[in-house]
Amino acid sequence: MARRALIVGTGVADRIAAGLADDYDVDRTPGAESLDLVVWADYPALACEPRQITDLSPADWDAACDTPLRSAIDLTRTVHAPLAATRGTIVFLVPLMASAGGAEYTALASLGEGVRILAKSLAKTWGAAGITAHSITLDPHAFLAADDAAGIAADNALHDPPLGRVPDDRDDVAPIIDWLASPAAAPLVGSSLVVDGGLWMPG
């Protein structure tokens, strides 16, 4: 019987869904009674556009950061029981800017850091139910237009990625997410992984 995954978001979420499709029945909206894996990457287009914070109206900020963060929190309430039914895993995908900062991406960085901390909090509170929670920080190319991502990567790196390339969302990142949902990864709790080929190496 195939495992069931819920993938929330577009863009990078679509590519992760494609990478997991051979091993999971993939849902894109909540509703299943049991879930082995939930992946969240629901970043609105407004957050992924370069904008000075002073150019964002209160309504813009709500749309780019506060509302999607609240939606992520609400999603966790919805998926708790389905994940508990299988002792499943929830993974939040986070842009590099949440850790390293990014000029003109304050909303995106704030939203990313919000869900990263949410993952840690869930790991502490849901562990007793057998649910594991993690975040994975990805290269800006996973979230931004190519030219914008290249600029952010250059601003935050002292070297080219040791891997020699940016990891592919479907072929490289999706298998890591699949591993996080495996029994072998069960002792790893509340991790904040960085999967960018070695571009950003936090201490």
Describe every region a protein language model picked out.
Residues 8-9, 34-49, 68, 89-94, ...:
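Rossmann-fold scaffold of SDR-type NAD(P)-dependent oxidoreductases
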Residues 71-79, 83, 118-119, 176, ...:
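Hydrophobic positions on the long internal alpha-helix
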Residues 1-29:
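Canonical Rossmann dinucleotide-binding motif of NAD(H)/NADP(H)-dependent dehydrogenases/reductases
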Residues 178, 189-203:
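Short C-terminal tail/terminal secondary-structure segment
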Residues 152-172:
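Catalytic Tyr-x(3-8)-Lys segment
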Residues 52-66, 75, 84-128, 137-143:
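Catalytic loop of short-chain dehydrogenase/reductase
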Residues 127-132, 188-190:
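Short, small/polar-rich loop/turn modules that mediate ligand/substrate recognition or access, typified
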Residues 132-142, 181, 194-196:
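Conserved SDR Rossmann-fold cofactor-binding beta-strand/turn motif
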